[in-house]
């Protein structure tokens, strides 16, 4: 029996020694791998072209998306401009062969819904934002969007004469609230102080209280995004909205608010309403595809025009050409710029005739014997931001 215990003790001792050796070797191996990874990471950091700071990467992506320049050029421009995005974009465009915008719209990481509705002589287009598509499709979220539509249509907002890049000068009297105005805290407070009306048409709280309730339930950053309201003052103004990627008739992922001016509107609608609605839908689909920043050259923000002209002029400053030739080159580039961002100057995207939108509108008026023009539009799309207008 003593002999059995002796062999058992010897076996256990040998096993413990072997296991200790194996663990020590594993520990040494893990430590070596860790050191290799650390050295590799340090080498990567030394050779990296740009900072890993999240904010810097967002700025870098933004500049690259607008200009389509290389990462190196965009990163260099951001450094030289102290991370000022607007100046960095200008810097890149002045120092590359192509000074034209690649895109005026960039992607942003936001989910939500766009909604629009007409009531009496008023029309509203708005967006409600959140962090996930799951919440955006929730019944309570959609109901809050509808309540927003109803209360903003039923209540006058004390904003005054505010103009947007999408306005036509002739529409100033009818213009109540611009899509870019919501950054004003007073307007936000005014909307959120309005009563919240539920599905049963009952009101027991304010819009702010209901918004906070939804935030607490879903644990997401739910907020009102862009907002536009247009009040019809001229009897010849035709109000129209178009929702793309619909959840239903009033709610979807993008939308257009459109105001047309048609002489003798009431009489025209008696016989040609369907034609006008279909044409308004076509114009709206063009706006969604082409993403213009203004109705006409005259209504484009003068700051945008001046800024673009300065960029073009700086890009041509090293060319040894007579002044008149340089001016012609500048005008040619400006014409190309206008054709990319001005609604009436754009090439119509719904057919292959290569007509300007302005010509398409004239042809429609001629074919239907009506005098028609575009006064105003707003365009909102979830996950998109216009770099010229916002």
Swiss-Prot record:
GO terms for cellular component: apicoplast; mitochondrion. The keyword Mitochondrion applies. InterPro entries: EF-Ts_dimer_sf, Transl_elong_EFTs/EF1B, Transl_elong_EFTs/EF1B_dimer, UBA-like_sf. PANTHER family: ELONGATION FACTOR TS, ELONGATION FACTOR TS, MITOCHONDRIAL. This protein may be expected to contain an N-terminal transit peptide but none has been predicted. Associates with the EF-Tu.GDP complex and induces the exchange of GDP to GTP. It remains bound to the aminoacyl-tRNA.EF-Tu.GTP complex up to the GTP hydrolysis stage on the ribosome. This is Elongation factor Ts, mitochondrial. It comes from Plasmodium falciparum (isolate 3D7).
């Amino acid at each position: 029996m003593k002999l059995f215990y002796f062999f058992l003790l010897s076996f256990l001792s040998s096993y413990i020694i072997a296991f200790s050796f194996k663990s020590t070797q594993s520990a040494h191996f893990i430590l070596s791998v860790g050191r290799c990874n650390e050295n590799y990471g340090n080498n990567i950091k030394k050779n990296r072209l740009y900072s890993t700071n999240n904010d810097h990467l967002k700025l870098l992506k933004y500049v690259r998306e607008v200009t389509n320049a290389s990462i190196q050029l965009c990163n260099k421009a951001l450094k030289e401009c102290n991370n000022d995005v607007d100046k960095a974009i200008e810097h890149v465009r002045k120092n590359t062969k192509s000074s034209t915008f690649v895109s005026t719209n960039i992607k942003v990481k936001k989910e939500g819904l766009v909604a629009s509705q007409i009531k009496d002589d008023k029309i509203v287009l708005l967006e409600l934002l959140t962090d996930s598509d799951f919440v955006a499709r929730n019944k309570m979220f959609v109901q809050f969007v509808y309540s927003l539509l109803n209360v903003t249509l039923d209540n006058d907002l004390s904003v005054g004469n505010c103009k947007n890049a999408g306005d036509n000068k002739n529409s100033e009297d009818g213009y109540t609230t611009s899509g870019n105005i919501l950054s004003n805290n007073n307007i936000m407070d005014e909307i959120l102080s309005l009563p919240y009306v539920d599905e049963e048409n009952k009101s027991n709280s304010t819009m702010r209280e209901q918004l906070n309730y939804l935030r607490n339930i879903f644990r997401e950053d739910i907020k009102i995004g862009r907002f536009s309201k247009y009040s019809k003052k001229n009897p010849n103004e035709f109000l129209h909205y178009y929702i793309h990627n619909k959840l239903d008739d009033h709610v979807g992922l993008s939308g257009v608010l459109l105001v047309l001016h048609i002489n003798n509107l009431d009489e025209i609608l008696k016989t040609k309403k369907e034609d006008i609605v279909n044409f308004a839908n076509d114009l709206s689909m063009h706006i969604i595809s082409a993403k213009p920043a203004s109705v006409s050259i005259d209504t484009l923000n003068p700051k945008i025009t001046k800024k673009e002209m300065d960029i073009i002029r700086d890009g041509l400053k090293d060319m040894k050409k007579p002044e008149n030739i340089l001016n012609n080159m500048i005008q040619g580039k400006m014409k190309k710029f206008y054709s990319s961002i001005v609604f009436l100057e754009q090439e119509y995207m719904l057919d292959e005739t290569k007509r300007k939108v302005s010509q398409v509108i004239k042809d429609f008026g001629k074919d239907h014997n009506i005098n028609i023009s575009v006064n105003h539009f707003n365009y909102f799309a979830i996950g998109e931001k216009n770099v010229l207008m916002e």
